[in-house]
Amino acid sequence: MSEVITGETAMDQVVIGTAAAEMAPTSEVVLETHGVNVYYGSNHALHDTSLAFHKGEITALIGPSGCGKSTFLRSLNLMNREIKGCRVEGEIIYDGRNINTCEENLYDLRRSIGMVFQQPNPFHKTIYENIVFAPKRHGLRGKENLDALVEESLRGAALWDEVKDKLNQSAFSLSGGQQQRLCIARTLAMHPDVILFDEPCSALDPISTLAIEELMQSVVKERAIVIVTHNMEQASRVSNRTAFFYMGDMVECGQTDQIFQRPKDKRLNDYLTGMFS
């Protein structure tokens, strides 16, 4: 049984961001899970997790290393299917169906539920081709259409002004922060309903981190965003909701200001106050 705490005993030094105030929550649920369990062989890594993700909101997943948050994130667009011996049980509801049991075209699914990884992973192609590669595969044709999509996506990722004169250069000519924004632009080009971010700033400097955070807040209006982060200050700055994971359990979830200022579970309070990490 979890121990409930009272009073404002969470870490007072975290300044709660303005995401919740600036982005009004909507009632439209874009993606939700019911009783999701994940196994790696005989290891039961994630236990009976149910969460809903709303259009126009950023949800942060926090918790110590190995607690199940990235495992849960990867289940949302069936990335765990790429891991030998991994089994996912429960319902993952997107577009009115349980994608965990449907025979999904994974390529099409990941157009709609995109993912940005911890390390930038641009294709070994030009900046331009990084953006148009997937749309061309899905049938987009015509230089005018492709050019417009490239500009739209790079502007969406706040990268256009920095690269508009070198679109035919290698993506690897960019800095690490620019490469990560290019990966976000590549995701935006598919017009996803959900974007999953798996510690997208862990390899970036503070300036690049701020740029990514501002970018997430600028593109969330038309979609749901889910971010895994070890940076509690980042979670407090960018998210509307926060879910705390511990030892495979989703322990507590709520509005970000409530999670950080008035945690109900002692394990969450201990994590926020540095009793463990």
Show where each model-derived region lies.
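ABC ATPase NBD Q-loop/coupling interface
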Residues: 91-108, 168, 259
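Conserved ABC ATPase signature
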Residues: 169-174, 178
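Conserved catalytic motifs of ABC-family nucleotide-binding domains
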Residues: 191
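Conserved ABC ATPase "signature" region
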Residues: 91-98, 143-165
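ABC ATPase "signature
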Residues: 253-254
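Catalytic Walker B motif of ABC-type/P-loop ATPase nucleotide-binding domains
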Residues: 195-198
